[in-house]
Amino acid sequence: MEFPNCTVVDHPLVKHKLTQMRRVETSTASFRALLQEISLLLAYEALRDLKVREEDIQTPMARTVAPVLDGKKLVLVAIMRAGQGILDGMLQLVPSARVGHIGLYRDPETLSPVEYYYRVPGQLADRDVVVCDPMLATGNSAVAALQRLKKSKPGSLRFVCLLACPEGLTNLREHHPDVHVYTAAIDERLDEHGYILPGLGDAGDRLFGTK
């Protein structure tokens, strides 16, 4: 099955690090470090088309014209709580980015998202916004977060995740065909509880050591 709204970052380092994260014996500290490392590599691909402009600068040897990022500062939005792991990695690459958080939890019965927190930078209009969440499972949380952000009319929206599955990608494409997804892998399917298979377990619990 092909997903035109999704780019899988096909790189040996990404594949290797993801395999280490999947292992049940991987410690919380290692899981956290690996997620930050993969996030850097995902960010490189997701931000490939950011606009640049030419600026006159002075090097130690001569004056020259060189490219710098153009436009308003990038905004990174983490879907709490596991999205913080990807956010931390991306901030190493773009430390000047503005940061927002959306708190959503999944109702265990309906699998629908319930919002409990929303705090993003003001004036999102015309800004490039990247939404971060390790797992694109049912896609319901991603759909809800993107819908909320669209009310502020951002210039562009992208979604960065560690793992996706066909169900989540299809759901997101149906509701937000304009949003491109960047991921390390597309796994097989969801189980009856809405978890990705083969997956890596609950990303939030493994990231924060809460289980």
UniProtKB/Swiss-Prot annotation:
GO terms for molecular function: GTP binding; magnesium ion binding; uracil phosphoribosyltransferase activity. Disulfide bonds: none annotated. Its EC number is 2.4.2.9. It holds the Pfam family UPRTase. The keyword Endoplasmic reticulum does not apply. Allosterically activated by GTP. It comes from the Bacteria. GO terms for biological process: UMP salvage; uracil salvage. 5-phospho-alpha-D-ribose 1-diphosphate binds at R81, R106, D133, P134, M135, L136, A137, T138, G139, N140, S141, D202. Binds 1 Mg(2+) ion per subunit. The magnesium is bound as Mg-PRPP. Its cofactor is Mg(2+). Uracil binds at I196, G201, D202, A203. The keyword ATP-binding does not apply. Keywords: Allosteric enzyme, Glycosyltransferase, GTP-binding, Magnesium, Nucleotide-binding, Transferase. Gene3D superfamilies: 3.40.50.2020. It catalyses: UMP + diphosphate = 5-phospho-alpha-D-ribose 1-diphosphate + uracil. Pathway: Pyrimidine metabolism; UMP biosynthesis via salvage pathway; UMP from uracil: step 1/1. NCBIfam families: PRK00129.1, upp. Catalyzes the conversion of uracil and 5-phospho-alpha-D-ribose 1-diphosphate (PRPP) to UMP and diphosphate. This is Uracil phosphoribosyltransferase.
